[in-house]
A protein has these predicted regions:
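Contiguous, well-ordered beta-strand patches that form the walls/edges
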Residues: 45-47, 68-123
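Short, exposed beta-strand-loop hairpins at the edges of beta-sheets
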Residues: 121-143
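Residue-level signal for WD-repeat beta-propeller blades
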Residues: 33, 60, 67, 125-126
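Short, solvent-exposed loop/hinge segments that bridge or flank secondary-structure elements
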Residues: 38-75
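Short, solvent-exposed mixed-charge patches
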Residues: 27, 148-150
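Bacterial N-terminal signal peptides that target proteins for export
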Residues: 1-12
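N-terminal helix-cap/turn-to-beta initiation motif at the start of protein domains
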Residues: 26-40
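C-terminal segment of classical bacterial N-terminal signal peptides
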Residues: 17-25
Length: 150
């Protein structure tokens, strides 16, 4: 009987155990990864029937930044309270019509949209790396800034 087959099996078993333990402790995807980050407003899409900004004031916010973290939201340097980041799936046309007295047509949202509560406003998940942000009566397209490589 050779000593090496036993050692070989022991090495294989140890490796398999280590891989299983690593997989079990691997970081799970963050359920809020689709909303967390730094977002830049790129375009005014539409407005609600009642807005607290003029069209010119709304246009001046294009290029401004929305920062969404798990414990805070900041828009254009102004902080909101800690967000709940609660989300719900809604019929986009009905939700925008009833909640904002606006039409969904120009927003480019899917028929069923995920709405995320950011405390001081709401964001609508549009597509990967794109959201629609509602701010003081206006809807904006926003894109996520790429994360810096480490």
């Amino acid at each position: 009987m050779s000593f090496f087959p036993i050692v070989g099996r022991l090495v294989v078993m140890t490796t398999l155990f280590a891989m299983a333990a690593h997989t079990a402790h691997a970081k799970k995807p963050d359920k809020d990864a689709d909303i967390l980050g730094i977002w830049t407003l790129t375009k005014v899409l539409d407005s609600a029937d009642i807005a607290s900004l003029t069209d010119q004031q709304a246009a001046a916010l294009v290029g401004k930044v929305l920062v969404v973290r798990r414990d805070s939201v900041m828009f254009n340097g102004d902080p909101c309270r800690a967000p709940g980041l609660t989300r719900r799936r809604q019929d986009a046309a009905k939700y925008v019509r009833e909640g904002y007295h606006a039409r969904v047509g120009g927003l480019g949202l899917p028929d069923i949209v995920t709405v995320v509560d950011l405390d001081c406003t709401e964001a609508f998940l549009k597509e990967r790396e794109k959201i629609v942000v509602f701010w003081q009566g206006y809807f904006y397209d926003a894109v996520r800034r790429p994360q810096a490589k480490r």
